[in-house]
C-alpha cells in the first residue's frame, strides 16, 4: 500500500513539473529567440524483491546453457533527470526596426550585466539606452559595447556585424562599432538563467568569440528577429496528455490514501 501511494506521489510531482515546463514554453511562443525546453525522465531505483536463476544460450558448442542470477525488480516511481534546451533555429521574421537583428548560425549575442557578468542570448530585438548604448530588452549592454551617436538618422548593420551610422543626414556613414558572436562547443551545457539568457559552464566550454560570417558563428541579419522555436501544436497536445496523466495519478493517490487509512483502521 505504501509503495503504491509513493509511486503515485512521485509521478504526480513529476507531471506537475512537466506541466509547468509546457506552460512556460507556450507562454514564450512569441518571445524572440526563445528556445523551447524538454523534460527528460528517468526511473527511480527499483526494489529487488528476490533473485532467480535464468538459463540462456551463450555458446552451444562449448557450454550450451549458462545460469545467471537475475533480480525481480519492483518499480518505485519516476523522477526528472534533466531539463534540456532545444537550440535549433527559429524562423526569421522580417521587421521595420533597424535595431532588430537575428543570427543565422550557431552564434549568441553577448551582453554585460550591471555586475560585469557576461550572459548570452539569441534574442536580437535590441534597443538603445539614454546614453546611446545598444542594449537588450532587459537593459544589459551589448558586449563589446556599441554607442549610437546623437542625431543619427540611419543605422546600418552588415552581415559581418559592423555597425554604421549616418549622422545629421551625412551621405557617407561612419563605422561606430562591431557586433561579435559567441559560440560554444557544447551549447547543451549552457545554464538557463531566465529572461532568455544563458551562462557558460564547464560543460558548455568557454565561448569562442568570432566576427559574424566566419566559421560556424553565422551572419547577422538586420531588420529581422528570430522567432521562438516552440511547436505550439505539439505543446498543446502534450498539455492535454499531461493533464490526463495528472488526473489519473490524482485518483491513484486518493485510492492509495484510502487503502492506507483502511489498513490503519482510520475512517
For every predicted segment, state its role.
Residues 1-267:
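Amphipathic alpha-helical polymerization modules
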